[in-house]
Swiss-Prot record:
Name of the encoding gene: ribH
Function: Catalyzes the formation of 6,7-dimethyl-8-ribityllumazine by condensation of 5-amino-6-(D-ribitylamino)uracil with 3,4-dihydroxy-2-butanone 4-phosphate. This is the penultimate step in the biosynthesis of riboflavin.
Official protein name in the record: 6,7-dimethyl-8-ribityllumazine synthase
GO cellular component: cytosol; riboflavin synthase complex
Subunit structure comment from the entry: Forms an icosahedral capsid composed of 60 subunits, arranged as a dodecamer of pentamers.
Residues that coordinate or bind (2S)-2-hydroxy-3-oxobutyl phosphate: G86, T87, R128
Keywords: Riboflavin biosynthesis, Transferase
Catalytic residues as annotated in Swiss-Prot or TrEMBL: H89 (proton donor)
SUPFAM superfamilies: Lumazine synthase
UniProt xrefs under PANTHER family: 6,7-DIMETHYL-8-RIBITYLLUMAZINE SYNTHASE, 6,7-DIMETHYL-8-RIBITYLLUMAZINE SYNTHASE DMRL SYNTHASE LUMAZINE SYNTHASE
Length: 156
């Protein structure tokens, strides 16, 4: 029986990080966690990491699609945060962001790691951006690295 599993070291990988500016006080912590993880665990050099900023979570799929279309990158890490308010807007934003990023991954056959927080409160966002609940940006970066290696093994 063959088992394919991916490690996280990918020293030659080119990674794009697409990040929303809205809620930047949270997202910058996610970005720091992602970059640190790519460099320390993935052994990805800084010159192989590109950060692309966009206004909000709704714009992440289009930016990720344009990045994927260039075929310059081995994976995309998407980062952002959507905090529930008093209207249905939260559900629409989260749903469209999630579906759009998944569509990019399938359309371009590239890992698109989901590091977009979808939380009820600012406190939950803070917890997931590097305090009590870890750093979801770092987790998304690990997922991207592992997927690069899994797909590489499948194709070889």
């Amino acid at each position: 029986m063959n088992v394919i599993e991916g490690g996280v070291a990918a020293p030659n990988a080119k990674i794009a990080i697409v990040i929303s500016r809205f809620n930047s006080f949270i997202n910058e912590s996610l970005l720091s966690g992602a970059i640190d993880t790519l460099k320390r665990f993935g052994q990805v050099s800084e010159e192989n990491i590109t950060v692309v900023r966009c206004p909000g979570a709704v714009e992440l799929p289009l930016v990720a699609q344009r990045v994927a279309k260039t075929a310059k990158y081995d994976a995309i890490v998407s980062l952002g945060s959507v905090i529930r308010g008093g209207t249905p807007h939260f559900e629409y934003v989260c749903s469209e962001c999630n579906k759009g990023l998944a569509q990019v991954s399938l359309e371009y056959s590239i890992p698109v790691a989901f590091g977009v927080l979808t939380v009820d409160t600012i406190d939950q966002a803070i917890e997931r951006a590097g305090t009590k609940a870890g750093n979801k940006g770092a987790e998304a970066a690990l997922s991207a690295l592992e997927m690069i290696n899994v797909l590489s093994q499948i194709e070889s």
